[in-house]
UniProtKB/Swiss-Prot annotation:
Protein name from the UniProt record: Probable lysosomal cobalamin transporter
InterPro entries: LMBD1_LysCbl_Transport (IPR050854), LMBR1-like_membr_prot (IPR006876)
Localization in the cell: Lysosome membrane
A Gene Ontology biological process term: protein localization to vacuole
Keywords: Cobalamin, Cobalt, Lysosome, Membrane, Transmembrane, Transmembrane helix, Transport
Record carries keyword Plastid: no
Function: Probable lysosomal cobalamin transporter. Required to export cobalamin from lysosomes allowing its conversion to cofactors.
Length: 590
């Protein structure tokens, strides 16, 4: 029975893994620029996103496996759950976590930077005449990646030798649970330090982008920007075009049709009016094409379905808003609980030994975890909400260095370099999200799940306690349980042990990670208040630039062709028409 149950849990995880591959692929193909598509960049981005999401979504498997050793109704271990069997379960989970965490670190610090420089090393002319070989390109990318290799080696060496927290300095850490967290293995300590540093860096990115996206995501679904074909914009465009033409006539009348006779100021004004008129006519044409019935039955059906399901879009936005508010409240309650009731405060990174304030998200997950995979479905949805919020935050804020925008994440217009940097940012955010969900959003669920213990002395030494008819004595597991039988019954999840080990051995990381949650809550509230009172507008300048570039590439011949291009972005298959090279004079790059 135990083998069958654990096998089914891993099968569910495998199904989720393949779904993650699909989600990552769709995300990459939707956002990348078709004319600059690169096989290597696409593969690395999809693989990296899948690996990092698989790391976070291992948590429900962790909870389900350790919880399967106990009966939450009776508060005791099941007959088959000997300590050897429990150790086998936790060991298999530890191997999976260390593999995924190490893979995430290698992808973030080595593979993605190498792919970035590999793409930058591409020279179309040299590649066509044969002067740029695979070896030269590889060596050129490797030279720049050496700095990241040295950074990774230094990071692990520092973690190998850096001093850790000692129990003699922390009088509140005499419990067996906390003693076990003090790492003595140098290899494990190096990985703990490296991931602790990456999580702390990720927390900073998480606070800036995910908090912004969590506030923007539901509001942008409820209040979307008007389309180019909306009556108001069309009327405004027609009015501006009419005024433009009238002003051109006035200026041409003054010069008798010869612009050289105009003063330099009015000549510049006439040139500006001509360019503006060209842009306004393009907008008019695109608006007419958008309103005109298409010959494609698929496109017409899509427009009709969009109109029919528009109320559902509003309802989904309201549902996301309710979920975002619930998550915000849950994070606030747990953060207050940690600040007030942590047994060791800043000495251990505000580890919370027991949940003292009711957390609605935590309550839902603890009770739903009694019926696997209900909690897994809810957890996948929660992670995707955070993931989409991070994407929205990056797309809105842009990839910046200080206040300078370096790259922009936009659907169908994201360069390979921007995709790779976005992937690194999402990797750091997801590592931070692993901490935030486990320690702040749902701490009891992520630590013990639905596990309980019978707080009643056993009838005979060596036996398990029996709470038959004594249901009030069946209590949730916690690190602060004084009953020695609780330590024999309750098994903490592997991920909670690992994260608590980081904050206990390196308290600085725990302090930064904890107080950053308040900045997350404050920034998301500020962005939400600003967004809710702000009317979304069409970015006309960006629209004109995109339309002009697409017009030059011959991609706006008809509405049907534009729909086909969008479908190609999603499926990743090129059309049968001749390929048009990108702005740099190249097609698909390897």
């Amino acid at each position: 029975m135990a083998l069958l149950q654990s096998s089914l849990i891993w099968v569910v995880y495998a199904i989720v893994f393949f779904l993650l591959v699909a989600v990552s692929s769709i995300f990459i193909y939707i956002y990348q620029t078709p004319s600059e598509r690169s096989t290597y960049v696409t593969t690395v981005c999809i693989f990296t996103l899948t690996a990092l999401l698989a790391t976070v979504l291992l948590l429900p498997v962790d909870v389900a496996l350790v919880s399967s050793t106990t009966s939450s109704r009776e508060g005791r271990r099941k007959s088959w759950a000997t300590q050897d069997e429990v150790d086998k379960i936790t060991f298999s989970l530890a191997v999976a976590y260390y593999f995924l965490y190490s893979l995430d670190a290698v992808l973030c610090l080595l593979v993605v930077p190498f792919t970035y420089f590999w793409y930058e090393e591409y020279d179309e002319v040299a590649s066509e005449d044969g002067s740029q070989t695979f070896r030269k390109r590889f060596w050129g990318a490797f030279k720049y990646t050496v700095a990241f290799i040295l950074l990774t080696v230094i990071l692990f060496l520092v973690g190998f030798f850096v001093p850790i927290g000692r129990r003699k300095d922390k009088p509140n850490l005499d419990l067996d649970y906390f003693r076990r967290l003090l790492t003595e293995n140098h290899g494990e300590r190096a990985l703990t330090f490296a991931l602790g540093l990456l999580i702390t860096i990720g927390i900073l990115v998480y606070v800036l982008y995910t908090s912004t996206g969590l506030a923007l995501l539901p509001v942008t679904i409820i209040k979307s920007a008007p389309a180019i074909s909306s009556p108001t914009l069309s009327a405004n465009t027609a009015s501006r075009l009419e005024e433009n033409i009238e002003r051109q006539r006035q200026l041409e009348g003054r010069c008798g049709g010869n612009p050289d006779r105009l003063p330099s100021k009015q000549r510049r004004e006439l040139d500006s009016l001509v360019r503006q008129a060209r842009t306004l006519r393009r907008r008019q044409r695109l608006a007419e094409e958008a309103r005109r019935p298409s010959g494609s039955w698929l496109l017409n059906a899509w427009f009709k379905l969009s109109a029919v399901f528009r109320p559902l879009k509003l309802l989904s936005g309201l549902l996301l808003l309710a979920i975002a508010m619930l998550v915000w409240v849950s994070m606030l309650l747990t953060s207050i609980d940690k600040a007030m009731n942590s047994i060791c405060k800043q000495n251990c990174g505000y580890i919370l030994g027991k949940t003292n304030i009711l957390n609605p998200i935590n309550w839902v997950f603890v009770h739903s975890s009694k019926v696997f995979p209900v909690d897994y479905i809810l957890f996948v949805f929660l992670v995707l909400v955070f993931f989409c919020s991070s994407v929205v935050g990056i797309a809105t804020t842009g990839i910046r260095f200080l206040w300078v925008r370096i790259f922009q994440l936009r659907k169908g217009h994201t360069s390979p370099q921007a995709l790779l940097i976005t992937t690194v940012m999402l990797t750091l955010i997801t590592l931070a999200l692993n901490y935030s969900i486990s320690m702040v959003v749902a701490p009891q669920y992520a630590t013990y799940g639905p596990q309980t213990f019978c707080d009643h002395p056993p009838k005979h030494p060596g036996e398990q306690p029996d709470c038959t008819g004594l249901e009030p004595l069946i209590k949730p597991c916690s690190e602060l349980s004084e009953n020695p039988t609780a330590k024999e019954i309750c098994t903490p999840t592997v991920v909670s042990t690992f994260l608590n080990r980081i904050t206990l051995n390196f308290p600085f990381f725990g302090i930064v990670d904890f107080w950053a949650q308040f900045f997350f809550l404050g920034l998301s509230l500020l962005v939400f208040l600003v967004t809710i009172f702000r009317t979304p507008k069409l970015d006309e300048q960006q629209f004109d630039e995109d339309a002009e570039a697409a017009e030059e590439e011959g991609l706006l011949a008809s509405t049907g062709r534009r729909f086909g291009a969008t479908w190609e972005d999603i499926t990743g298959r090129a059309s049968r028409s001749p390929q048009v090279s990108g702005s740099a004079g190249r097609g698909t790059r390897e």
